[in-house]
């Protein structure tokens, strides 16, 4: 049998030939994409003048750009897959960011394939926003490994072409999206949602009443000893409904990945600090930030309840994610997320966190999802000497993305001087409202990322906060900073308006406040 190195050497010429062919196809198809985008723009211009009667040409123009993006995504995936075969190593994670791109492209293809003329507007907006985020993440992983991974340039070229097409699709969609969506007034908001008895069973009922599909116990008293085994077993036996996996009290030293195709997974533990999942991957340890996550969930409808996610790589290990979520319509309830730098990666799509504790140091809540935190405890730990703490680092890279971080009715505290956030990407968007802000939050509130980057294009808002750190008199004076939002402005970042939670959250059984809290 040939050695792995000889196999790799044999495949490299084929890979290079494949690159030449793919790049040639990209040059041809990009020209056609420009033509389609140009024609589609004219369709959308007509639609903008006659919004009440969109023509079939308008829809066809938009769908054509989506199809073009999908064609390029398929080519990019073929390239990524070929590169994973040609660059096998013993320590794959240390050198190969292409696996990140491959996983993200699968997610993008899943979303693009679901777009058709009759989709709900907010679903389409979410999918296009997430597809762009996936490209940003692929490029970030390639950049993190640029010195050790020599095929990164080819993948980066393909990724950037796809990014351009997805940007065109998103721009066209935003240009025609209904501008007349009615925001509920404060008086019209219904009170805190209380789930029905049947819905409450999902997130409130004792485990014994849940009719779980698998039981995981380290001592062998369940159906499986590891979470990974339970996920694999239930995925093979799934009938398409919700899969409920009970994790008995104990410490699980595993890295868990719930892929895009594994939807509606619910992990149920015995409580914070009782059911604990621990990992130690870190950027300094050779992993891309994306792959450092102790638990990663990409499958739509993910729910986690009553457990703790930990990355114990330590404060000197740089990026080390405890929980990464890129699952649409996901809920994290009564959990704890513990780490240092980059503890919680709210990667993409619509997410909701309730009664959850999040601890960390640098940028410990980051990503580009549309996410609302309610009734959570957010605590910054003591940083390393000379290090500064930032609660958030929101990653919105395009003004058309419907993403951002909304922190409502939470407690934000810190062991040392900490900033509410800084702009990871140019159009970073974060709002803190109706929350308690401790005295260790810096009077300026927000910090630059680097120089003047994003300070005019970001959106940082505050509304109705309390506590010794809530005074806005010393807040930064950037044009993108809004320390005193109006009621109307704040309502845009509530559960009902920002993540359409009043539509999909009831089925999860979690209690939530759809609007501003009285």
From Swiss-Prot:
PROSITE patterns: PECTINESTERASE_2. One of its GO terms (cellular component) is extracellular region. Residues 30-172 are annotated as: Pectinesterase inhibitor 16. In the N-terminal section; belongs to the PMEI family. The record marks 341 as: Transition state stabilizer. It catalyses: [(1->4)-alpha-D-galacturonosyl methyl ester](n) + n H2O = [(1->4)-alpha-D-galacturonosyl](n) + n methanol + n H(+). Residues 213-502 are annotated as: Pectinesterase 16. Glycans are attached at residues 82, 161. The lineage of its organism: Eukaryota, Viridiplantae, Streptophyta, Embryophyta, Tracheophyta. This is Probable pectinesterase/pectinesterase inhibitor 16. SMART domains: PMEI (SM00856). Its main location: secreted. The active site is at 342 (proton donor), 363 (nucleophile). Substrate binds at residues 289, 319, 422, 424. GO terms for biological process: cell wall modification; pectin catabolic process. InterPro entries: Invertase/methylesterase_inhib, Pectin_lyas_fold, Pectin_lyase_fold/virulence, Pectinesterase_Asp_AS, Pectinesterase_cat, Pectinesterase_inhib_dom. Its EC number is 3.1.1.11. One of its GO terms (molecular function) is pectinesterase activity. Expressed in siliques and floral stems. Pathway: Glycan metabolism; pectin degradation; 2-dehydro-3-deoxy-D-gluconate from pectin: step 1/5. It is an enzyme of class 3 (hydrolase). Coiled coil: none annotated. Gene3D superfamilies: Invertase/pectin methylesterase inhibitor family protein, Single-stranded right-handed beta-helix, Pectin lyase-like. The PMEI region may act as an autoinhibitory domain and prevent untimely PME activity during transport. It comes from Arabidopsis thaliana (Mouse-ear cress).
């Amino acid at each position: 049998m040939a050695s792995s190195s000889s196999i790799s050497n044999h495949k490299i010429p084929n890979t290079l030939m494949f690159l030449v062919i793919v790049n040639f196809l990209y040059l041809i198809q990009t020209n056609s994409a420009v033509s389609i985008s140009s024609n589609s723009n004219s369709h959308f211009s007509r639609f903008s003048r006659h919004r009440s009667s969109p023509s079939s040409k308008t829809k066809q123009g938009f769908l054509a750009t989506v199809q073009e993006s999908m064609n390029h995504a398929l080519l990019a995936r073929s390239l990524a897959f070929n590169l994973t075969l040609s660059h096998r190593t013993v320590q794959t994670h240390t050198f190969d960011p292409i696996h990140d791109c491959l996983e993200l492209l699968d997610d993008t293809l899943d979303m693009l394939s679901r777009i058709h003329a009759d989709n709900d507007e907010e679903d389409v907006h979410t999918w296009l926003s997430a597809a762009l985020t996936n490209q940003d993440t692929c490029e970030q992983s390639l950049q993190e490994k640029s010195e050790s991974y020599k095929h990164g340039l080819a993948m980066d070229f393909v990724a950037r072409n796809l990014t351009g097409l997805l940007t065109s699709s998103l721009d066209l969609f935003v240009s025609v999206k209904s501008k007349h969506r009615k925001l509920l007034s404060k008086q019209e908001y219904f009170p805190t949602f209380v789930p029905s008895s049947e819905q409450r069973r999902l997130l409130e009922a004792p485990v014994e009443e849940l009719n779980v599909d698998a039981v995981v116990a380290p001592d062998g008293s369940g159906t499986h000893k590891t979470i990974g085994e339970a996920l694999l077993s239930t995925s093979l036996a799934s009938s398409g409904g919700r899969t409920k996996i009970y994790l008995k009290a104990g410490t699980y030293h595993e890295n868990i990945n719930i892929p895009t195709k594994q939807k509606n997974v619910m992990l149920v533990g015995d409580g914070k600090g009782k059911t604990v999942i621990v990992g130690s991957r870190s950027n300094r340890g050779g992993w891309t930030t994306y792959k450092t996550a102790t638990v990663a969930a990409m499958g739509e409808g993910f729910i986690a309840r009553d457990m703790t996610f930990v990355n114990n790589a330590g404060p000197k290990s740089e990026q080390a994610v405890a929980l990464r979520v890129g699952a649409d319509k996901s809920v994290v309830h009564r959990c704890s997320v513990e780490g240092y730098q980059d503890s919680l990666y709210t990667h993409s799509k619509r997410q909701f966190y309730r009664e959850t504790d999040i601890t960390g140091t640098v940028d410990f809540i980051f990503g580009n999802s549309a996410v609302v935190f309610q009734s959570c405890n957010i605590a910054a730990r003591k940083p390393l000497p000379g290090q500064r703490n930032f609660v958030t680092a929101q990653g919105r890279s395009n003004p058309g993305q419907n993403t951002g971080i909304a922190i409502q009715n939470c407690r934000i505290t810190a062991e040392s001087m900490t900033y509410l956030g800084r702009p990871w990407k140019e159009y970073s968007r974060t709002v803190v409202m109706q929350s308690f802000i401790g005295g260790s939050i810096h009077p300026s509130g927000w910090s630059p990322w680097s120089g003047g980057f994003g300070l005019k294009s970001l959106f940082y808002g505050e509304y109705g906060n309390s506590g010794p750190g809530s005074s806005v008199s010393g807040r930064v004076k950037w044009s993108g900073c809004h320390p005193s939002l109006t009621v109307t402005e704040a309502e845009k970042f509530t559960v009902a308006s920002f993540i359409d939670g009043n539509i999909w959250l009831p089925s999860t059984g979690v209690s939530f406040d759809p609007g501003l809290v009285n």
